[in-house]
Each structure stands twice: as C-alpha cells, then as structure tokens.
C-alpha cells in the first residue's frame, strides 16, 4: 500500500465519525506521525510503499480512532503553545482556549512587573545584573499534563514555577513534559480542596488554574470522545457546588498571594459573572476575558488594596 492509498483509506474511515475537514486533518496528523514525513514530503513520495510495520501501526491507530478515542490519546501527543506534550488518559487534552490564558498571564507579568521583564531580557543576553532582580513565583493548581507551568516557564524563564495536582499519575505526565521541554518546575501532590494541605504550598505572585468546572448535568450535552476517555476527576463538579474550586482558590489566594499578585483562572462559559462575583465577594477586583470564540473563558482577580 502506498502513502497516498493509506491516507485515503484512513480518511475515508474517519468520515464515519467526523466531518470531511476534521477527518482530513486527523489523517494528516496520523500519517505524519507514522511516516515521520511532513505533508509536502508525503505528496512528493505519494507512490512510495508504506513499510509493513508502519502499515500495522497505522491499522492499530485506525482501530483506536474508530472507537471515538481522541487522536491526541492515540498518538500520545498534543500541541500547546507551539510545543508537543505527551498526554494519556490520566490528563485532559490541552485546549486552544487555555493557550489564551497563558498569553494573558505572560502579558500581565511583563506589563505589571517591568523589573521582571528586564530580568528576563537580561537572562536572554547573559546580563549578570538580572541576578539581582526579584524572582517571580507562580503556582498552577490542578496542573494535569503540565502544559500551563511548562509554557509559562518557557515564556518567563526566570520565574520560579510550582504546580500541584491530586493525581499521582497526572503528575508523572507533567514531570515527563517538563523534562522533555527542559523547563524546571516544582511538582507537588496535593488535594487542594483539603485546606490542611495549603501550608505545603508556597506564597506566590501568580496563581493560575484551569480547575474542574463542568456541572455533572452537562454530561448529556458532551461529545462521546470526551466522556469516554478524558478523566472525569479533572472535568466535573457537583451541580449544587459548581464553583467549589474557585471558592477554594480565592480563599487560598487571600493567604498565599503576594501583595501585588494576581489570580488567573479558566472558567465555564456560562458561569463568568458568578465566578467574578465570587472573587469580588472575597475582596478581589475581578475581570472577565472572552476567548477567541467570544465566550467568557477567563477571570483575572487582584486583591483590592
């Protein structure tokens, strides 16, 4: 079977589950993963035969994909902020909306902390003066794959970055990604909703979290590939306490956020005003930011002076 025939066969099979465009995109991704060749190179060699072991691999991937398993879990790869991250079913698949959260944090860190921005620039050019600048400390709560802290460390290399999760398996994935990207991150296994554990977490300048925020009742509206494969622990909260994690984050920030620090959280698109009100009720100035689809997706909160 040639490269071209293999891709056409895969794409046709995927149209049982996806529209034509998405099926084509997934087929491209899988073929690049199997062959190690970019699309342009595969086109130039479309009549080349696919090696038997590669064909076996492709058939196994196809079998998994036809069970609605997300392609990121099949290939154990998801792209985030221009970097490949290892993912498996112990962690959520990183979403483009979360990249916007990372961008917002980076902009705030540079814009509100000019001394830190200079320090980062100084490190890039080997300026020894940067060693005297204050260290920016940040904590990602519920880190999952580690995509947020790893990406922030890449953007803000002088930052001291911490990340916690209740899941030992998720932390193993996050540590693997930090090592692959050569980004030192301090990982901690913590049940964040247990306030007795807060003393083990550092005081920081930035708290970031993409916590579970989907009410259990929303399961009926969700795609099968999400429900069947992504970890429910990282997705769902009780219908009667949908803001449980945001309440805990706000209370933790009251005690562990530096005086000029900031909280950034990803939110449910329907709960923006309620999340903002929650932070404001605990003494924060809060702001909602929409994502690229025009949906309420992020909240920034700063303690009122």
Where do the model's predicted regions map?
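Conserved SAM/SAH cofactor-binding pocket of Class I
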Residues: 100-121, 126-221, 248
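Conserved hydrophobic residues forming the short capping helix/wall of the S-adenosyl-L-methionine
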Residues: 14, 109, 178, 253, ...
């Amino acid at each position: 079977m040639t490269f071209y025939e293999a891709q056409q066969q895969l794409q046709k099979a995927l149209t049982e589950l996806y529209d034509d465009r998405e099926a084509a995109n997934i087929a491209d991704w899988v073929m690049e993963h199997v062959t190690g060749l970019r699309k342009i190179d595969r086109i130039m060699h479309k009549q080349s035969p696919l090696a038997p072991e590669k064909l076996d691999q492709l058939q196994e991937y196809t079998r998994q994909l036809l069970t609605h398993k997300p392609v990121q879990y099949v290939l154990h790869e998801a792209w985030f902020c221009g970097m490949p991250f290892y993912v498996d079913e112990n962690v959520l698949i990183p979403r483009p909306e979360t990249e916007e959260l990372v961008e917002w944090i980076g902009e705030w860190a540079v814009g509100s902390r000019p001394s830190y921005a200079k320090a980062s620039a100084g490190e890039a050019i080997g300026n020894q003066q940067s060693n005297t600048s204050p260290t920016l400390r940040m904590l990602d709560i519920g880190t999952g794959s580690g995509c947020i802290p790893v990406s922030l460390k890449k953007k803000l290399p002088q930052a001291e970055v911490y990340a916690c999760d209740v899941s030992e398996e998720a932390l193993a994935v996050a540590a693997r990604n930090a090592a692959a990207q050569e980004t030192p991150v301090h990982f901690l296994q913590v049940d964040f909703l247990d306030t007795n554990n807060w003393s083990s977490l550092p005081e920081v300048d930035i708290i970031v979290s993409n916590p579970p925020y989907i009410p259990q009742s929303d399961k009926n509206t969700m795609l099968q590939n999400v429900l069947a494969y992504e970890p429910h622990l990282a997705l769902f909260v009780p219908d009667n306490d949908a803001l449980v994690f945001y309440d805990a984050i706000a209370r933790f920030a009251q005690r562990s956020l530096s005086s000029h620090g900031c909280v950034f959280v990803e939110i449910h698109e329907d709960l923006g005003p309620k999340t903002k009100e929650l932070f404001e009720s605990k003494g924060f100035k809060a702001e909602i930011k929409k994502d690229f689809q025009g949906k309420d997706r992020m909240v920034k909160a700063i303690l009122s002076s």
